[in-house]
């Protein structure tokens, strides 16, 4: 497949000029370590180190050494702080880390991690070249991309380790579709591209449903075996991996050589798996408490009218901090162990809650937006029900919008 080195060099040069090598804002190795003063922050997230390590240990026990773990820490460890958690990953002996951005790769390597580092999405060519110093293994699921990646590797005088992605489960995102003759030819051709070392074949499941996962797994096993036979790949040198958190917990036969848990590491699992602990809590403060008469309206658009004389607490958090407008007149927060309702529209930096039935609430009190306070809890189920989306859609934003504080327990 002909390709102009001059055109490739020009395109990469323009990409590097127009975009930084990092696909996310620079991350800190120490951002949020316990010296952060919560009194200086309008909102913050607390990251439970002991819970994170418990979840890794629980998963290691369940796998019993039969499959290795690749801890997926993309999106700054799902908003939990990759720099904060890498010491635990290293201490727990996790052999592989999965990331999305070059910035995450930098933090992983600077933490002292010497193990396997995988990018769990297809890179832009400019990203791929900039990531070479991190010895990151790249996902390849397209022949044209493979050829261009090969030229980059050749120019740097080194082979590029790749994971060949197959579209076995119908995700239609990063993998070669092996159901067509052209797709099968392309997959074999990728294994023959010079300067690329295929060390793994992988897929990704599209649905959290055991039957769907098993169907995708059956297709993957058949396609991967066909590919290894036709391309004459040494099975002993190929890692097969497919399982995300759901498949890891619910479909044991999907474990293969390696699993790629993400959410499970942070306690985000299906409800039946209570053995995994929640790692993040989202918190704020009460700024003030005011009294308003019956009939007053609350917030922009007058969406809530007080049905009685009421005490309203002003909370120092809003949608710019990740507490979305979806919680308008629907959300519940915890103050001093009381469940109190959000009233009126959530503003950019403020929300109001009705504390009429919680007379002990005062300025300066801690507010739990997600997590525990005493015996009370704001649960994943109620948050997802109100927001109408996965909890990860929220906590990745909470963690990347607010200071993070690492707690030992």
Curated annotation (Swiss-Prot):
Residues found modified as N6-(pyridoxal phosphate)lysine: 74
Dependence of activity on temperature: Optimum temperature is 65 degrees Celsius.
Listed Pfam families: Ala_racemase_C, Ala_racemase_N
Catalysed transformations (reactions): an L-alpha-amino acid = a D-alpha-amino acid; L-lysine = D-lysine; L-arginine = D-arginine; L-ornithine = D-ornithine
Phenotype upon gene inactivation: Cells lacking this gene are no longer able to utilize D-Lys as a sole carbon source for growth, and also the utilization of D-Arg is strongly reduced. The growth of the deletion mutant strain on LB medium is slightly retarded as compared to the wild type, which might indicate that ArgR is also generally involved in amino acid degradation.
Ranges annotated as spanning the membrane: none
Active site as annotated: 74 (proton acceptor), 300 (proton acceptor)
Origin superkingdom: Bacteria
Localization per Swiss-Prot or TrEMBL: Periplasm
GO molecular function terms noted in the UniProt entry: alanine racemase activity; arginine racemase activity; lysine racemase activity; methionine racemase activity; ornithine racemase activity; pyridoxal phosphate binding
Family: Belongs to the alanine racemase family. Bsr subfamily.
NCBIfam families: alr, PRK13340.1-4
Subunit structure of this chain's protein: Homodimer.
Protein's name according to its UniProt entry: Broad specificity amino-acid racemase
Gene source species: Pseudomonas taetrolens
